[in-house]
Amino acid sequence: MTALLCLSSLFPFSFMVKHGNRKYLCTFVNMKTFVIAGCGRLAGIVSEAVVKGLLPEYELVGVYSRTVAKAERIAGRMAEAGKSCAVCTTADELLALKPDILVETASPAALREFAVPALKNGTSIVTLSIGALADDAFYREVCETAKENGTRIYIASGATGGFDVLRTAALMGKATARFYNEKGPDALKGTPVYEEALQKE
């Protein structure tokens, strides 16, 4: 077997192996670890992507939710797939796992709780709760903390679908686009405005 170094920007840790008339691309993946804060529907989608092998370079090592049963459900699903995932009951416990990335899928309040400690921990953040960053003082604190600690905060479109499409339409110049978004009545459960009659409308 002859190993040929492959200097591909797509596969920086790859090399070609030639065996007879066949060539094989061998890739060493630098696995990144991540944790999830908030174990609702979006966290379920992310964890299922791990189970299905759609995120081969990432390992989910811990989950946290104020509702422990939700975190246990995700960790249980990971265990069924032969993957280890810790159920954490505090933010400190989650960050003690020293993840590369924290995926925040909970709420603006959760981002306020996790952002600065995570960034100081050497953990970058992917957040779906961008509303918390509308507070100028908090935004500046997060940016400064990230710079000081060599970490990053990635702002995702979040639970409101269509923002990526709207950004694309904006790049088209004189395009016109309309965006409609509806949430089901279950999204209001546990709030003062929820009424059972909403289920029938």
Residue ranges and their predicted role:
Residues C85, N121-T123, E148-T151:
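A short helix->loop->beta-strand "cap" motif at the edges of active sites that frequently abuts
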Residues I130-T151:
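Rossmann-fold NAD(P)-binding glycine/threonine-rich loop
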Residues E104, T127, I153-S157:
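General beta-strand structural signal in soluble alpha/beta enzymes
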Residues T89-K120, A132-D135:
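Beta-loop-alpha module in the N-terminal Rossmann-like domain of NAD(P)-dependent dehydrogenases
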Residues T27-R77:
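N-terminal Rossmann-like dinucleotide-binding module
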Residues V68-L97:
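Conserved N-terminal Rossmann-fold NAD(P) cofactor-binding segment
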